[in-house]
Curated annotation (Swiss-Prot):
GO terms for cellular component: extracellular region. The gene is yebF. InterPro entries: Uncharacterised_YebF, YebF/Cmi_sf, YebF/ColM_immunity. Residues 30-117 form the YebF/Cmi domain. It comes from the Bacteria. It comes from Salmonella paratyphi B (strain ATCC BAA-1250 / SPB7). Residues 1-21 form the signal peptide. PROSITE patterns: YEBF_CMI. Belongs to the YebF family. This is Protein YebF. The keyword Secreted applies.
Amino acid sequence: MNKRGALLSLLLLSASVSAFAASTESKSVKFPQCEGLDAAGIAASVKRDYQQNRIVRWADDQKKVGQADPVAWVNVQDVVGQNDKWTVPLTVRGKSADIHYQVIVDCKAGKAEYKPR
């Protein structure tokens, strides 16, 4: 009986560690043309990209927030950047939880990296 309990505890621990590691990985994606945009334009682009392209493809985000169409927002005053490279804090709110990303956008390269905060 003790061996079963120890084995079950080990399995649960390893599953939770791997789930935590998966949730802290950053996700690199292609990003639409954004050269020349200001902070408000970048904020709108990041929000639109997440709602139209990311949530529909990232099942782990849907599961975490508890819905397929969560609310996403960016506080424009927190957006910083120069030379078409931006850092955008994105908050995604669902029925079950919130997800916070630090989105690093490189407009010239056409890429963005979503890093969990």
